[in-house]
Amino acid sequence: LLDVLVNVRMTVIKLEGGGLWVHNPVAPTGELMSMLAPLVDEHGPVKHIVVGSAAIEHKIYSGPFSKKFPSADVWLPPKNWSFPVDVPLEQYVPYYPLGSPKTLPEDTASGVGAVPWQGEIEHSVLQVGGSSLRGFKDPWFVDTAFFHKKSKTMLVTDVVLHVSEDPPPVSAIDPEPLLVRGMERPDAMLPNTREARSMGWGKTVLFGLLFQPAAVDVKIDLANVNKSFLDGFTWDPSWRDGFANLCAKPLFVPPILQVLAFPRRRDEVKAWA
């Protein structure tokens, strides 16, 4: 709607007994499959496809990805409904070679629950809040922290972030979303330069984490709503300071979660952390 570019990432870990463990799979394009092929040749097949978040953008490709690796188990976090409307994942992605996905136990670090990889990778699931649409039964924010013991690497999806000053290199393939978002005022389209893409990246980050940054004035023309959502924005130069402040933090909790999610369950969040 806002032409905001949001990249998601996938992580692959080789298991000590052979095979691969995949975290938050992305679309199994030809390019991705060609990148995975050498890993499969060297370390063995994909054994586990693991999604740590309830957000649809992170689990939507678990079905298509598992179709490429039909012998792999698919794992999703518990109480895995999608905010704000609960639609079973099988209706979004009607193909899982081994049937319905398996459910991650809530915590392996404390010895509760068992998964095949727990000797190498520990995990703990965070479930926060409850939606009135579900009678406050199920959490609307779910994330999972995984800890790979050998490399001492932590994997999370949304709960902790680091923002780089430069946009991800993949965004240069189709720079239009960044160029549109980088405009300082309506109809002031930018040339495709590194500086312009960086401006678009900074504003994209602010939109993605804040929704309504203080440095932007939005004017919606009801006679031309679609165009307004693309370029009806006038930015104050102070956006640069806001973006720089985010980049200066080694790690931080997204402001949206700080305001909307975590205050509801402070004790649970502290215990999980």
Each model region followed by its residue ranges:
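Divalent metal-coordination and catalytic microenvironments
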Residues: I13, S53, F146, D158, ...
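Core dinuclear metal-dependent hydrolase active-site scaffold
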Residues: D107-L155, V159-D166
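Active-site-proximal segments of catalytic enzyme domains
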Residues: I13, A27-L32, E120
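Active-site HxH/HxHxD metal-binding segment of metal-dependent hydrolases
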Residues: L39-P116
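Conserved hydrophobic/aromatic beta-strand scaffold that supports enzyme active sites
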Residues: M10-V12, V22, D143-F147
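Cap/insert and terminal regions of metallo-dependent hydrolase folds
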Residues: A27, A37-H48, I56, I60-K68, ...
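Short His-Asn-centered micro-motif
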Residues: H23-V26, V50-A54, L76-P78, L126, ...
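Zn-dependent metallo-beta-lactamase
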Residues: L1-G17
